[in-house]
Amino acid sequence: MAKKRTINELRQVKDSVYVNRNVKKSSVNFVDEVEEFNATMGKPNNYEPTIPEKKEWQFVYDFILEELEEYKHACETGNIVEVLDALCDIAYVSLGNGTMLHGLKDKIWPAYQEVQGSNMSKACTSEEEAQATVETRSKEQGEPCHYEKVGKYYIVYRTRDKKVMKNINYYRPNLLQFFTSDELSKFI
């Protein structure tokens, strides 16, 4: 029977197992670490944009759903340690495994920054802009919206659940910019 290893012994394995040290590092350290894990465990690492076979992407999809259920259970039971575990696992699987499975390692960080900029464009920079946004979004939603001043911005919320509404000057993230025409031609 194999001897059970201690946490410190397992950490030493983690620190010593670097299958491919010549791999180009990304701006997202944990994606690099998942890449190392995949290489060590014989899991796929793709380096060009791809939609792999269904069994491969379905595994990641199902794993994300499983981790979301663990997150929900941890919240329902008030277990903050399990909340942290679930959040780490969700990031590991979705941003780590998903990124490497779909060959998006070099795109994930700039794409994330583009999405962050888009999300931040939901903030109104003037009260007039907030008032116009409230009027527009209330009509679109068919229910009341309101704004609140938060720091130097005006944030428009759907009143019922305080969901942040898109500013009338919101911009959609342009994720197309991160693909070459050759990369995209494989999917059209």
Regions of interest found by a model, annotated:
Residues 2-188:
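Flexible "arm" and connector segments at domain edges
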